[in-house]
């Protein structure tokens, strides 16, 4: 259970750093003129897909943790 918490925390931390870098890049692009290129559209789509996958993994992890907790404490 501790290992799962550490890995979820690591995913959250890496996602936060990635989001921060993307926001900095967007701000720099806005200062340059605000034109959206095809590469930026792809990057935005992949970033959204990645965030969706991370949130799904977090939800699944929480579900597994609650089930394991229930079974270990024999309160199910």
Swiss-Prot record:
Q: Which residues form the propeptide?
A: 23-41
Report the superkingdom from the record: Eukaryota
Q: Which N-terminal stretch is annotated as signal sequence? A: 1-22
One Gene Ontology term from the biological process aspect of the record: defense response to Gram-negative bacterium
> What GO cellular-component annotations does this UniProt entry give?
extracellular region
Tell whether Isomerase is among the UniProt keywords. Answer: no
Tissue expression: Expressed by the skin glands.
Listed A to Z, the keywords are: Amphibian defense peptide, Antimicrobial, Cleavage on pair of basic residues, Disulfide bond, Secreted, Signal
Places the protein is found: Secreted
Do you know which InterPro entries this protein is assigned to?
A: Antimicrobial_frog_2, Frog_antimicrobial_propeptide
Intrachain disulfide bonds: 70-76
Main subcellular location of this protein, as a coarse class:
secreted
UniProt keyword Membrane, yes or no:
no
Per the record, the similarity remark reads: Belongs to the frog skin active peptide (FSAP) family. Brevinin subfamily.
Function of the protein: Antimicrobial peptide.
Q: What is this protein called?
A: Lividin-2
Organism field: Odorrana livida
């Amino acid at each position: 259970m501790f290992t799962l918490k550490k890995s979820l925390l690591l995913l959250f931390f890496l996602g936060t750093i990635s989001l921060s870098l993307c926001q900095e890049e967007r701000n720099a692009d806005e200062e340059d003129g605000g034109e959206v290129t095809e590469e930026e559209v792809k990057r935005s789509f992949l970033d959204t897909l990645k965030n969706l996958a991370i949130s799904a993994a977090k939800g699944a992890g929480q579900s597994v943790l609650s089930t394991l907790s229930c079974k270990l404490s024999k309160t199910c």
